[in-house]
Curated annotation (Swiss-Prot):
Source species, domain of life: Eukaryota
Biased composition (Polar residues): 550-563
Species annotation: Homo sapiens (Human)
Name of the protein: Suppression of tumorigenicity 18 protein
Chain ranges of zinc fingers (CCHHC-type): 359-402, 403-446, 715-758, 759-802, 807-850, 860-903
Binding site for Zn(2+) 5: 816, 821, 834, 840
Coiled-coil stretches noted in the UniProt entry, renumbered to this chain: 920-992
Compositionally biased residues, Basic and acidic residues: 171-181, 677-687
Amino acid sequence: MDAEAEDKTLRTRSKGTEVPMDSLIQELSVAYDCSMAKKRTAEDQALGVPVNKRKSLLMKPRHYSPKADCQEDRSDRTEDDGPLETHGHSTAEEIMIKPMDESLLSTAQENSSRKEDRYSCYQELMVKSLMHLGKFEKNVSVQTVSENLNDSGIQSLKAESDEADECFLIHSDDGRDKIDDSQPPFCSSDDNESNSESAENGWDSGSNFSEETKPPRVPKYVLTDHKKDLLEVPEIKTEGDKFIPCENRCDSETERKDPQNALAEPLDGNAQPSFPDVEEEDSESLAVMTEEGSDLEKAKGNLSLLEQAIALQAERGCVFHNTYKELDRFLLEHLAGERRQTKVIDMGGRQIFNNKHSPRPEKRETKCPIPGCDGTGHVTGLYPHHRSLSGCPHKVRVPLEILAMHENVLKCPTPGCTGRGHVNSNRNTHRSLSGCPIAAAEKLAMSQDKNQLDSPQTGQCPDQAHRTSLVKQIEFNFPSQAITSPRATVSKEQEKFGKVPFDYASFDAQVFGKRPLIQTVQGRKTPPFPESKHFPNPVKFPNRLPSAGAHTQSPGRASSYSYGQCSEDTHIAAAAAILNLSTRCREATDILSNKPQSLHAKGAEIEVDENGTLDLSMKKNRILDKSAPLTSSNTSIPTPSSSPFKTSSILVNAAFYQALCDQEGWDTPINYSKTHGKTEEEKEKDPVSSLENLEEKKFPGEASIPSPKPKLHARDLKKELITCPTPGCDGSGHVTGNYASHRSVSGCPLADKTLKSLMAANSQELKCPTPGCDGSGHVTGNYASHRSLSGCPRARKGGVKMTPTKEEKEDPELKCPVIGCDGQGHISGKYTSHRTASGCPLAAKRQKENPLNGASLSWKLNKQELPHCPLPGCNGLGHVNNVFVTHRSLSGCPLNAQVIKKGKVSEELMTIKLKATGGIESDEEIRHLDEEIKELNESNLKIEADMMKLQTQITSMESNLKTIEEENKLIEQNNESLLKELAGLSQALISSLADIQLPQMGPISEQNFEAYVNTLTDMYSNLERDYSPECKALLESIKQAVKGIHV
């Protein structure tokens, strides 16, 4: 068999409508058990190692091309329809079972000499199974089997080895049929196979198997698609005049009555029937055709119906492939990278919380990931506790590849833990169960509810009863197979999945010091979510919740929850108890709460008055809405498919985690504008009525869990719950670590965030009243809480002491309230700062004189009626304490800035007036000064004209000087050239007259050169004289010597 046979699934080449295949699958699986599967199961049981047959949902081979297979399927059907139309004879199916492996093919070729009587028995059984197809059409049950998470937290399915060992194909080969004794039972391909090797059939059918709950050697044949995708059937070819030889059909009535005993020899034998000649086969086939004609017609009709169903599935596969091709490629790469980086704890790790005596899971490699680091120099001091890059001294040398590789490894191994609420509040350094609040919660649950595990009154999970019926149904459908007892299977599953509810209210009371709330069974609320919106981001969600109990559904499939739901809901409930302590999970109360939102709760979170003052008061009267119904409109009755988990304090199902991740991410800012349900204080103030109403509200058919009623004292009911006054704060992250003792904004991490958000909304009202002050440098450090001049550095520097003016003194609001008092004689001595009757001598005098008839004094009446702020025009709003009766100074008044500005303007006007009155006294002096100014201006003009003339003369002289300087330069250059020529001539003359000596003179030289020249000039100038012949000869010789000199 070539490589293409491994990638193709079963097909049929007839026409018709779809028919259920459950009965056919069951009979064929009983008839043809896989010897190879038996051999592998025996080996695995001998070794004692569980076989990991799960494969990722997204792993598929590189040759994944459903379009080509779909086209090939259509072409095969077109070619096969031709002989059916041309031949008028009724055709019978020739069956040959093709193994999926080359080893099985070789076994089939060796066993090609099987006996004819056994072949006829097989043919008889095949026809009988096809006849009963119509009877089981209404009995096909669509069941869903949930899967546990694989190593990376994504749903795992069956591996392709099951498909290769348990699938068979049927075809014809020129009238000769070959039967293999090791034919595997027919099974449907799961979702993993439709993504990997059976992708050309378009994700047609799926079967999710649970390794823990599957009985040994009992194959399950279920459909998980709500669209009723049909299973693929053996491929059958029909030919014109050739029919199947069915010898000894009438002689095998005992085998017809007991097909299982009849199949014992074919399954265990090693020989294959040898066939007679072609002529004998044709004659016997004609005989069988006349007897079994009607049965074959029914079988052919049923197979034609199956062919149409498979054709529809092939077309659907093409559409699914085009839609999810890119998504599968991306998720495949992400999954491969994640599996290389981390090893997530699976169901084996979860048993640690179920059974305290279970062995600890295998530790991960506790080596520092940085190359060349042996653990020395770390912050922890020991590298077995150092499994990340943080705290390593060699962190600077880490290449980018290692940083990217260990980016997602640093997760908390606790299922459902996102790193929040740890002891060190950093999940990057939290890689173990120590310090994890969810792990502590589950350990506390085991110790508290140990007695409830053994109690027979514990309510059974609906899925356990469902599994019991499922095991019984499998036992009824396969009577000849040896399976384990239903009680043993259910008890084993109860160990793995049946967890006892955990009281998180008592956990809050012990760990966080919180007074426990009412322990009642809350009403169920499952928010409806469309099936198409289940986990829209399957890449981001597993990183957020590494091992959460939510199922990642394949696209286009309906979501359902089955066997592992109780275990998953337990982890989700534990995660919800911790996540409720986070400031970013306030929507969880909306999901879990079964009371609708009241009108007053919308504005109860943040109250800001018209001047922008934040009311952080603890003593507020909250009106309870007693007529609020207990359940909302979307309350759903629990079903085995949804399987919500009910605890004694809260109710959490998988939809809660879905809503928590879809509504708001961890990194998004808190939205205080959302409306919330009733707070814990409102729930606590009316506990008795809620207890009675919740007991009366019961759902039909619901398994009730007894919850004891706590005895609540009257003073505990009336006592107000002391919570943090910051809106949106649940007490986590305070400096004290316990919000029960935290009754103010100091030490709250959300106080600054809340005030900044309010400041952004009410920036004008919350500004510092000092002009030019932006709030920086205050004593409090935050101008959002600084609305007065106290603590402002600019107010101290630029502030001016107020001196009351006459108008302010005459203002009646600034006077003493006692009638007739002008402020004199007060204790303070200044009536401007005395605005009450205390310290007034007239007040004391009149109080003595007034008869004690119960009537109050006039100033007391005025004070009660008009207790205004002493600043004019201020009604007391906007002060720091928001109570102007206790406000007896200007500090904290927002209108004080206007008074300061007014004081500054009055001082400027005063200085101007002083300059005006103390300066010039008369107009004459002003006129005299004006005349002097005019004279000075005229003299200035004259001087300026003279200056202009002088400037022109200076410029002309400067130009002349420049020209003279240039001429001097030229003369100097000429002189230098002449001196050079003179020097040259003197040297030439000295050299030429060196031999001639004048009388009475020595030989010519530089020292006597001038004298020598003077004598020569005198001699030549007096040529008219009569010289002696000697002198004449001397002159001639001198002339001859001088001829060589050129001037």
